[in-house]
Each structure stands twice: as C-alpha cells, then as structure tokens.
C-alpha cells in the first residue's frame, strides 16, 4: 500500500469513511465494519512495523491481551489482522478528540484535568489488576467522548500496540520523544519495571494537563535534557505556574513522580483521589506518601462506611467470588493469563540517542541528586530522636500491593498457565459443611467466624488457578487481613493456630451438594518454622484427589494466610513458604 487510503476504498473488508489521524505508528481511519452495522476506528500500522517479523508476533499476542480487557474506560479491541502486508487493528470508535487536543484548544481546565486523570486511573487500576501494563500513558491516548449530556466520557487507548512496540524497540523519532516526556526513570535506566511506571507517567500527564508543559521541557539536545530530568531532577511544581493551585497539588505530583517506585502511590485510584482532594480541599488528614509496595494493582475506598462495604480497585460487585482456600469450587470462567513483562522496554529506534543521554547524564553527575521536594517532605512522618519509630499500620489500600505479581506466583509453583480471579474483599461463608465445624479455618482462610470483624480494617484475598480441566486444579490462595493494631493480629494468629492444633493429625469430613459423597481430608500435625505455621491436608478418595499445603503467619497488624494445591508435594511445600515469606518481607515492621 504505497499511499494512504481514500474514502470509499476497502481495506481488509472495511470500507474507509475518512481519516481520523496519522502518526509514526500508522494511520487511523473511520471505517465501516464488514459484518456489523457500525463504524470502527481502523488503525493500519506503518509499513516499517509490519515488515518486522518479531514485531508482528508480538503485535498479535499483545492485541489479543488488549482484546481481553473489558472496562468502560478502556477502548475495546474488536479485531486484528494483516492485509496486503500491513498489520491492522479495529477498535471501538470514540466520537471526539483526546486530552492533548483539548489542551491545545485551551479547553482543558484544572477541574477537567483532574477529572480526566481520575477516569484514566480507573482504567489503569483495572488493567494492572489483570497483570497488564500500558507503557505509553500520555494525554494523546486519553480519548474524550462528545457526550450529549452528563459527565464527559474518558477512554484509554493503545494498550496492545504500545506494549508490542516497547518489546521490539521499533518506533519513529517523533514517537520516541513523545514517549520520553512521560517515561519513568526505571524504564529509561533499563531496570525492571511494573505498573508503577504507568503511575509515574500518569503524574507527568497530570502536570502537562494542568500547566500545558511537559514536566521536563526539551530544548537543544532534547533527548538528553528530558532523560536527565526524569533521572535526576526533582519533580516540578505546579503551584508557581498555575494560579489557584496549592502546594498540596505539588505534593501529589511529587509522590506520583517519585524516582523510587516504592515511594509512589499504591494505585492510580489513590493518586486520583489525592489529586481531587488537593484541588477541592477535600479531607486529606493523615495522608502521607505511601510506604514501599512491590506491586500496584488496586486502590482503597474513601473512608466513610464500614470497610467491607467498599470494594477495592475497579471491582464494584462480587456476588459470588471464588472462595479462598480448599476445597476448590466451581469458579467462574477464568480470564486469560496476564503477564507483567519485566524485561527492559527499548524506547525506540533512536533510543541509541536516549541511551547516550543516560550515559552522559550519569557520567557528569558526580553526586546524583536525591533532594526531596519540600512539599513532599513536609508530609512525611517524623520520629523522636530518643524513641525508635514504630512501624506504620498497614491500611486497607495497601493490602493488594503486598501480594507477589502473577509471574512470581507462577515461578513459585512452577506452573505457567495460571489465571487470577476477581479478589475477595470480605469474609465469605463457605459453600458446604465440615465436620468438626470449627475446622473450616484449617482448610482455608476467609471464613467470617475466624475473625473479630470489629477489629478488621482491611481484607484482600486472591485466588489463582488453572483453567478448569475436569480434575482438581493447581490453585494458589492468598489472603491478607489488616487489623487495627499488631497485638490484635497476633491474637488472631494465636487463635487460628489453636484451631489448627485441634484439627491437625486427624480426619475431617467435607460435604458439598454437587458432590456424590463426602470427602475425607487427612490433616497433618501443624509445624512452626521461623514464625510460619504450616499444615498439610490430603484427599485420596474417589470424589477428589488433591494435596493442600497451608500456611499462616502475622507481622505488624497483618495476618497472612496462603494455601497451595498441587500434586507436586515438594513444590507445594516450598511454594507456600516462599509466598508467605515474600508477603511478610513487604510488611513494614
């Protein structure tokens, strides 16, 4: 295809209506779906990209991942393919412009900017919870609908293509410079990264929407200047650029753009809430930059009603969540596995220039600057010089970040086709019955009777398993419960350990209505090693044949409960201890 498509021409069955835009990655057209009565956004990728065999393979895989994302703030992917040697992808058509267009048209007010970031944050929290990193967060990818009434709709676009580009290092000079303006330091430095890189980029995007400038402006030697800014300069302030914005907004952006990913917000939603509070003067009592957290997947709810009435992240309802622990029930259809890709994303073909910039900046910086912005430092907690500081209480919003990423769980258990289900956000009454009745907590966590709910301030459970095969699946259950203080967590651990001792070294009987007969479970005598209590449960009957390794521990105000079902006995024992220790290591204290 030597020239761009004209109106009325047909490409891969799609009838072209008009061009919507063009860039280094390709051209986007409004095109009529060949089978359905609707128009879609058809992106035809540049010939340079389409010719690259590695990119083609990655494009197909990442487009499939993007097609599995289903969220009102994410542009839906309908189809992808190749035609006449060109790769293409058909997406939901959003009738409107994007946030970059609105900024240039001088219609991006401060209130609108904070609203747009809040809507994008919903999309990011959902994607991160599925194990998907966007990698190219910038205002041009924030599509704005022309709503007839009510709130403006915001959709995040270009998931799959950005990921595929990042893995191959193919793009154009213009695309590279646009991406550099929002790139996280760990990405530019060639380090491993996760969803928190998206949060840094979202902080850069908010700065741009509020001020009309990129955080680190490019002049002569554009790539060098921008990379140097991201790596070594403190986050810029908005209060001295935009009348009416306070130091509180400076602190919010400073946290989002922290050089150390562990000092950023624990979720995009937490960032958006803090930005709205800074703009409107909402309640921010007690808010400080977040403690280190290894993995960003979700957000906490605004305080108000009881914690169990507030879902975490983008989840709004969990009528029948998959239960944490043994025995496995009939889980909903699993999602496709999402993978955090931890390899270095080469920023582009001209990243040779950017790499040189990193080298030049590093070599000329005899002492890297680590100054903390005054506004952020003012919000940091202080401690007495004579009294050792107490570890901070772990709050509800930080619980998801304590769990290992999906890829790490796969490595722990040695199984790669695991998928994560929707999280469990409150204790769940088990399906079925057990004899003796008090032994439910030994079989699996999350049973309401195991906790004094009046002392619980946060609850987060995640079940990860294989797609259904008709046999007992390999399954990992992770549950973390935050209590009002450390003493309460230790009391709950002691109570659970007592139940385990009473239920260990015997046979307990499970029954569920869908089973033909009860299941006999043999339980081992609990063992305690390095503060972790473990128990093994096995079923060898005709209804179910499975082994479960179960572990509980507590640190600070958090109770940790992990169980693993796998036929590989040695792997299960190692994995349940490994995952428990991983979580404990991330809890302050």
UniProtKB/Swiss-Prot annotation:
PROSITE patterns: PROTEIN_KINASE_DOM (PS50011), PROTEIN_KINASE_ST (PS00108). Its main location: membrane. Residues 364-589 are extracellular. One of its GO terms (molecular function) is protein serine/threonine kinase activity. The modification Phosphothreonine is found at residues 168, 171, 173, 179. It is an enzyme of class 2 (transferase). Keywords: ATP-binding, Cell membrane, Kinase, Membrane, Nucleotide-binding, Phosphoprotein, Serine/threonine-protein kinase, Transferase, Transmembrane, Transmembrane helix. Residues 1-342 are cytoplasmic. Activated by certain divalent metal cations, such as cobalt, manganese, nickel or magnesium. Zinc or iron ions do not affect activity. Residues 365-400 are annotated as: Disordered. One of its GO terms (cellular component) is plasma membrane. It is a single-pass membrane protein. One of its GO terms (biological process) is regulation of glycolytic process. In vitro, phosphorylates various substrates such as EmbR, PepE, MmaA4, Pyk, LldD and GroEL2. This is Serine/threonine-protein kinase PknJ. The gene is pknJ.
């Amino acid at each position: 295809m030597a020239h761009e498509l004209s109106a009325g021409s047909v490409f891969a069955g799609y009838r072209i209506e008009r061009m919507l835009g063009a860039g280094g990655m390709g051209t986007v057209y409004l095109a009529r779906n060949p089978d359905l009565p609707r128009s879609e956004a058809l992106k035809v990728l540049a010939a340079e990209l389409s010719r690259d065999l590695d990119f083609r393979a990655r494009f197909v895989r990442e487009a499939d991942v993007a097609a599995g994302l289903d969220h009102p703030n994410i542009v839906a992917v309908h189809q992808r393919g190749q035609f006449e040697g060109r790769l293409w992808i058909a997406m939901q058509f959003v009738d409107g412009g994007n946030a970059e267009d609105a900024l240039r048209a001088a219609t991006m007010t401060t209130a609108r900017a904070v609203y747009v970031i809040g809507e994008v944050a919903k999309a990011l929290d959902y994607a991160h919870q599925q194990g998907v990193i966007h990698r190219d967060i910038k205002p041009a990818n924030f599509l704005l609908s022309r709503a007839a009434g009510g709130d403006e709709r915001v959709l995040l676009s270009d998931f799959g293509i950005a990921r595929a580009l990042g893995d191959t290092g193919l793009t154009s000079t213009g695309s590279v410079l646009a991406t550099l303006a929002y790139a996280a330091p760990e990405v530019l430095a060639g380090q491993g990264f996760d969803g928190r890189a998206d949060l840094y980029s979202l902080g850069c995007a908010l700065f741009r929407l509020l001020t009309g400038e990129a955080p680190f402006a490019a002049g002569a030697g554009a790539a060098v200047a921008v990379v140097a800014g991201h790596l070594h300069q403190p986050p810029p302030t908005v209060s001295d650029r935009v009348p009416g914005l306070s130091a509180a907004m400076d602190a919010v952006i400073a946290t989002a753009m922290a050089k150390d990913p562990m000092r950023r917000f624990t979720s995009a939603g937490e960032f958006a809430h803090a930005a709205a509070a800074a703009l409107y003067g909402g309640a921010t009592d007690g808010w400080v930059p977040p403690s280190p957290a290894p993995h960003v997947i979700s957000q906490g709810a605004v305080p108000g009603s009881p914690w169990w009435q507030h879902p975490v992240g983008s989840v709004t309802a969990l009528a029948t969540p998959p239960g944490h622990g043994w025995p496995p029930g009939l889980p909903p259809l699993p999602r496709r596995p999402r993978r955090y890709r931890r390899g270095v994303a080469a920023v582009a073909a001209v990243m040779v220039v950017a790499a040189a910039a990193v080298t030049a900046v590093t070599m000329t910086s005899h002492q890297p600057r680590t100054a903390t912005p005054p506004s952020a430092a003012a919000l940091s907690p202080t401690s007495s010089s004579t009294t050792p500081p107490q570890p901070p209480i772990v709050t509800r919003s930080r619980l998801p970040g304590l769990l290992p990423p999906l890829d790490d769980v796969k490595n722990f258990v040695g199984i790669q086709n695991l998928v994560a289900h929707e999280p469990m956000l409150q204790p769940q009454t088990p399906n079925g019955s057990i004899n003796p009745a008090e032994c439910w907590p030994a079989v699996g966590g999350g049973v309401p009777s195991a906790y004094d709910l009046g002392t619980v301030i946060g609850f987060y459970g995640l079940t990860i398993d294989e797609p259904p095969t008709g046999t007992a699946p390999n399954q990992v259950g992770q549950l973390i419960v935050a209590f009002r203080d450390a003493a309460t967590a230790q009391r709950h651990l002691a109570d659970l350990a007592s139940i385990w001792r009473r239920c260990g070294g015997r046979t307990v009987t499970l029954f569920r209505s869908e089973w033909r007969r009860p299941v006999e479970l043999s339980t081992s005598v609990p063992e305690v090693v390095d503060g972790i209590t473990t128990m093994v449960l096995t079923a060898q009957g005709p209804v179910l044949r499975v082994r479960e390794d179960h572990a509980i521990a507590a640190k600070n105000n958090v109770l940790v409960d992990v169980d693993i079902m796998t036929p590989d006995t040695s792997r299960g024992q190692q994995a349940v201890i490994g995952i428990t220790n991983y979580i404990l290591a991330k809890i302050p204290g």
